[in-house]
Amino acid sequence: MTAPTDPQLHLDQVMSRLTGPGGRFELVEEPVLGTRMPVMKNRGRSVGELLTTSLRWGDRDYLVTADRRMSYTEHAAAVAALATALREDYGVRKGDRVAILAANTPEWVVAFWATQVLGAISVGLNGWWVPREVEYGLTHSRPTVVVADAKRAETLAAVGTDLPVLTMEEDLPALFARYAGSPMPHTDVDEDDPAAILYTSGTSGRPKGALHSQRNILAVVDYHRFSDAVVGEFSGRPVDPAVPSPLRYLLTSPLFHIASLHNLVIPRLATGGAVVMHQGGFDVDAVLRLVERERVTNWGAVPTMASRLVEHDDLDKYDLSSLTSFSLASAPSSVAFKERLREKVPFARNALVDSYGLTECSTAIAVATAPELEQFPGTLGRPIITVSMEIRDPYGEWLPDGVEGEVCVRSPFVMLGYWEDEAATAAAIAPGRWLRTGDYGLVENGRLRLTGRRSDLILRGGENVYPTEIEQCLDEHPEVLECAVIGTPHEDLGQEVAAVVVLRPGAAATEAELREYAADRLSYFKVPTRWRITTDLLPRNATGKMVRRDITV
């Protein structure tokens, strides 16, 4: 059969074949927590089962660092040993929590899978938390045991917890040896049983624990399998699910977030691909050396990392020809930034992808392909498979295309709720399992365009001002590296618009110049009236999101 000359038509036909009756990813409508929605017919029911089936990938690389390699066989043996130790020595049972507090390391991944085969709940604590925040996380999640690296074990000592703490450097190797050869534990779970707790970034308050189910995580795995299959069919190289994937994914974001855990480490175990893990702070040259050595094919980066690539003065000294997919995620980026990225970074020119998602949704809500970013700049693509998306007004009513409102979504990816927080769950999940994202946007040509966070909205004299619009405008100025726009109190207007602008090295733009630049491109009430020009980078959290509450003018 000859493929259509229209790429979009070809893509639609490929997706229809894969998801139609009898297709590998056939879609059916079934009840999920009391609400009917599209789901994949041929799906798994237990996250732990993925570990058992991964044994077929044998001695292939699963986890790779700068100085270590762990095959699928070695990984499964370590998981079986640790799971047995957790069950026999620490009494971990189905539904118990096992907290993981560490930087990115293979042992983090082993601890996650050991928890899963026991039917317990993996709690990914933020490795950047200070003692006060760690204490909150422990009190909130009430784990049976904590697995930590040496540095975070010191933090736990400062907290004074009486929980058992297993260190990755000493305790885990001893347990691997003691329980070597143990059979893999198996625990029966239901599809909607909880599997993991990951904490929200907490950019506007205390972190909440998003509770993800077996269904949520397995749906993410199937989404990535589906995406791989679509690419294979579209390019004329169909994917055989019985053959291990040749793809090698670079992991640069923390494992305690969905980008690295749900959307990389877990699905790649299911497909037989390799996870190449950068450890330590983000160093461009160290990362690029790893890409070159390991022939990395796919990399999902936060915009702050991509910005370091743009500023690098000698990318050509590295052989980066293996990279065929480069995606942005976890934080917004402007059209101007994407243009600079494509111009400066060779592997981003034809492979750049952007997406929109949040912890509560387990994965992306919408994805924009490279052609879409070119044809529809400023948008974030269309909803991914099984995601229903609506724009709603403050009363929860549907709004038509082109009208701005709150982005609301429903899918098998949406979390069960917030761990032990019924009020927050009720506020976030509307009847019919519709998640209120808290983000404002609109739909253009079937594609999502975000306008800002509801919590970031500036109310100036009766006018709604979205910081994102102003930030993206200022970001286009050639001397601006990054910027933040916030609202500050004003006696008459309620709030006024203020901007903190970080200049590029050697730049000398003045407040007057930037004010004039903004005034030429924005309505008068959107032009900042207060400015702070600096060379100090803006505060960001572990996923690269700007922490507005820490910004002052």
Curated annotation (Swiss-Prot):
Keywords: ATP-binding, Ligase, Lipid metabolism, Nucleotide-binding, Steroid metabolism. Signal peptide: none annotated. The keyword Heme does not apply. Pathway: Steroid metabolism. PROSITE patterns: AMP_BINDING (PS00455). Induction: Up-regulated on cholate. GO terms for molecular function: ATP binding; cholate-CoA ligase activity; medium-chain fatty acid-CoA ligase activity. Pfam families: AMP-binding, AMP-binding_C. GO terms for biological process: fatty acid metabolic process; steroid metabolic process. Belongs to the ATP-dependent AMP-binding enzyme family. This is Steroid-24-oyl-CoA synthetase. The gene is casG.
